[in-house]
Amino acid sequence: VLIIAVLFLTACQLTTAETSSRGEQEHLALRSTDKNSRMTKRCTPRHGVCFYSYFCCSKACNPSSKRCL
């Protein structure tokens, strides 16, 4: 029974993946761009508000003024 359930779930996943990718090839570039934008980390420029040094592009944050150096 367990083997049948695993085979059924695998078949469902393969069918779903094939169906969803077939009709959405034109959106591939958009999805790729969205994924890249989420992976890219932005840093806070000089004099920007900061709470931790690693948010600043310079990796230095003034704790009293809460500004990047």
Swiss-Prot record:
Propeptide segment residues: 18-40
Keyword Ubl conjugation: no
Keywords for this protein: Cleavage on pair of basic residues, Disulfide bond, Knottin, Secreted, Signal, Toxin
Subcellular location: Secreted
Extent of the signal sequence: 1-17
Annotated S-S bridges: 43-57, 50-61, 56-68
Top-level lineage group: Eukaryota
InterPro entries tied to this protein: Conotoxin
Tissue expression summary: Expressed by the venom duct.
GO molecular function terms noted in the UniProt entry: ion channel inhibitor activity; toxin activity
GO CC terms, sorted: extracellular region
Family: Belongs to the conotoxin O1 superfamily.
Domain comment, as recorded: The presence of a 'disulfide through disulfide knot' structurally defines this protein as a knottin. The cysteine framework is VI/VII (C-C-CC-C-C).
Name of the protein in question: Conotoxin AbVID
Organism expressing this protein natively: Conus abbreviatus
